[in-house]
Amino acid sequence: RCCRCPFYFVKTQRSAESTMTKKEALSIVFSCAPLYKENLVDRSLLFITTDKHKNVHCLEVTFDIGNFLHMTGFKLRKSGINARHFFNLCYDKRLTEADFDFSADGTTEMKMRVLPSLMKKNLSAKMLGDYNMSQPKLYTDKIAGSLSACMGFVRDGGEGRFVPNTVLEGDIRTKVKAADRIIATYRKSRSEEQYSEIVFTAKKVEWEKIVLPDEYSYLVLPE
């Protein structure tokens, strides 16, 4: 009987942690899908950052309908539902509790807690950095976020444009090698060649000292 005690303790702890219901998760993705489509789908964001030496860097990321599934952590139970179909089911509020399971490691609930705050035009991102491999099971490359929520990006097909592949809870500074400050974020639709819309501007930036890379020298900086 004694040898069962530790096992029983762990089991009750896990069940206590898993407090979110499928109904609650559906409510979250149903509210996030329209925001994702309105603010991010078929658009690109350009992050302008400065490192601790005041060097200026730029990172462009692109969003598709099919990326939404990765952000939820849902495990689909039906092979007939692909990533694009999943988004449409969420957008139309037709996804059911029978269509998915939560990830066994608790990441689905974690992603549900932070997803709403990331569905903004600028992802609510204040910092950007290279992933520091701090979570062994997590594969991502670049991370943009804040002190409470982050989004991870990888190169599409291993090369080319960066696309989102996960969302994370917690302080970005614990997840990246060095957290560069985002001083401005621009947004454009995929059909546009250049960026013109500014969706985030940091405070206390000496804009007259900012020198952009040649590729983005056309950008109009904030004043």
Model-derived segments and their meaning:
Residues 1-141, 187-223:
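An acidic, glycine-rich, mixed-charge low-complexity segment common to nucleic-acid enzymes
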Residues 136-142, 149-154:
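Catalytic micro-motifs at enzyme active sites that drive phosphoryl/nucleotidyl and oxygen chemistry
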